[in-house]
A protein has these predicted regions:
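Generic C-terminus detector
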Residues: 50-55, 67-75, 397, 404-442
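Eukaryotic short linear interaction motifs
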Residues: 103-106, 137-139, 166-168, 195-197, ...
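Catalytic core of DAGKc-family lipid kinases
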Residues: 179-336
């Protein structure tokens, strides 16, 4: 082990001379934490660009230096390893899931360059590592590993290097399981997807590698969930839109989610952009799919989605519930959500508080493509769209949609990224789930 280094604080940077005689600077914004070793020695863990000469590089690796003494300016960075990573009495089982297919494609690199070194630095030697082989891997892992441990009362922490899909797959398996949960697993998100709605909503947006600070400084909070029950003929859309599958193996036809349920423009965009025809265009597929929905190539106006929407509301836990149907039967955008953000800057529900369990409804009716784009732009400007007269924004307990569309493509519903094609004259009911079976580190 090399000798600890002498350091100085210069402005907002840490200055030191390496053992090779090179003068180095660490920006405070790049410091992850300070570990207390044997006083007075401390270790500074910090991010370093993997290509130091490329200022636009977004790839970082985690490095460590041992220092002789702790400057006062570094005191706020000192942490104690949290119990969800290391506990003297009953150590949790640490499981890392690396989703190789998630949006940015960087999950494996982030694990190798950042997460694995972190485990080494904090002395975490025993952990299980899983890399996804297909879209079914996380669900299979949950049924074979995570559920059994939760049922047997084994404390466990699941670190997901993935998009929202990894969390949704775990959630689905837990809520569809018939076994009782004795100890809820703690889930930590290291977001590697494109939207990362849950991670962005709970504030995992800071630092070179979002989510890592929360893993070290956060604590568990239970995750609120909604249940989406579909009419019996509804089918999951799979294989990039080419095939259909049963929603579940029982008669309930129910999916579970923690982020968003939508119909109309949002659901159609998610569904179309995930089809074989669009996926071959890579990241451009979202823009192309949106363009076709807003400016159809046959020259017609944007589609008017037909259906009856019924909202159930309540003024408080002990208050009676009331039902009210939306007057209009034609819609452009209808969405229920438990979170404020669908993307980092896309504030769809500004009144939402992460993990508080309140469901909110956002809707607007048929309008021109230009007016719809204006509303979406306002959502990127601090959620100002909800102040427009054309937008319905309300706190709800439940929503039911009875579809009145002939074509299947206008009867597709999005549940946390999964697409369901509802049968003709079918319906969906989305309501808040009472039980909370999973915890999120935040």
């Amino acid at each position: 082990m090399s000798e600890p280094l002498a350091v100085d604080v210069v402005g907002n940077t840490l200055k030191y001379t390496s053992h090779a005689g090179i003068e180095c600077l660490i920006d405070f914004n790049d410091i992850l934490c300070v570990l207390s070793n044997h006083v007075p020695t401390h270790s500074v863990l910090f991010f370093q660009r993997t290509e130091p000469d490329g200022p636009k590089s977004e790839d970082f690796s985690l490095k460590k230096i041992d220092i002789e003494s702790l400057p006062a300016a570094l005191s706020p960075f000192v942490i104690k390893i949290p119990s969800h990573l290391r506990h003297e009495d009953e150590p949790p089982v640490i499981q890392v899931v690396v989703s190789s297919g998630s949006g940015t494609g960087k999950a494996k690199t982030i694990f190798q360059d950042v997460v694995r070194p972190l485990f080494t630095y904090i002395g975490l030697e025993n952990y299980e590592l899983y890399e996804t082989l297909s879209a079914q891997t996380v669900g299979e892992l949950t049924r074979s590993k995570f559920l059994e441990r939760a049922h047997n009362g084994v404390p466990q922490t699941i670190i997901l290097l993935s998009g929202d899909g990894g969390l949704v797959d775990i959630l689905e398996a837990f809520y569809k399981s018939k076994t009782a949960i004795d100890v809820s697993p703690n889930i930590a998100l290291i977001p590697c997807g494109t939207g990362n709605a849950m991670a962005n909503s709970i504030g995992l947006r800071s630092g070179p590698v979002p989510g890592l600070s929360a893993l070290l400084r956060g604590s568990p909070s239970s995750i609120p969930v909604f249940a989406a029950k579909f009419s019996p003929g509804s089918r999951l859309v799979i294989d990039e839109g080419r095939q259909r599958a049963d929603i579940d193996t029982n008669v309930h036809h129910t999916l579970y989610g923690a982020v968003v349920a939508s119909w109309g423009l949002h659901a159609a965009l998610v569904a179309d952009s995930d089809t074989f025809e669009y996926r071959k265009f890579g990241v451009d597929r979202f823009k192309m799919a949106a363009n076709e929905l807003l400016y159809p190539s046959d020259g017609t106006p944007p589609h008017q989605f037909k259906g009856k929407i019924t909202l159930t509301t309540s003024k408080g836990p002990s208050e009676a519930r009331s039902q009210e149907a939306v007057e209009e039967l034609e819609h452009m955008y209808a969405l229920a959500t438990l979170v404020p953000r669908l993307e980092k800057e896309f504030l769809i529900s500004p009144d939402s508080v992460p993990l508080d369990g309140q469901m909110r409804f956002i809707r607007f009716g048929p309008m021109s493509a230009e007016d719809a784009m204006h509303l979406m732009t306002l959502a990127y400007q601090g959620g100002r769209h909800v102040m427009e007269d054309t937008v319905t924004y309300a706190k709800i307990e439940q929503i039911r949609i009875d579809f009145q569309e002939d074509e299947e493509r206008w009867r597709r519903v999005c549940i946390d990224g999964k697409i369901v094609a509802v049968e003709r004259d079918g319906w969906v009911e989305i309501c808040k789930e009472r039980s909370r079976l999973l915890n999120l580190i935040n």
